[in-house]
């Protein structure tokens, strides 16, 4: 099911990720969920894709997710 707001995300995602990372997760999940209609693994695929999107912009350091530094 798509998430309309960050408050609708699973509690574990809300606890783990900072707000901007939640935005990335939600947008990627919703896009992937829509793209995989008819796939029996639709929700699982959407969660995997959403985590991959977060990991492109954030890095887990200890128990925290921190924004990756941009290279110029």
Q: What name fits each language-model region?
A:
Residues 1-72:
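C-terminal alpha-helical interaction appendages
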């Amino acid at each position: 099911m798509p998430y309309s707001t960050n408050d609708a995300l699973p509690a574990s995602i809300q606890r783990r990720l900072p707000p901007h990372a939640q935005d990335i997760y939600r947008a990627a999940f919703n896009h992937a969920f829509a793209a995989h209609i008819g796939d029996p693994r639709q929700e699982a695929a959407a969660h995997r894709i959403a985590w991959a999107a977060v990991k492109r912009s954030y890095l887990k350091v200890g128990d925290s997710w921190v924004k990756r530094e941009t290279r110029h």
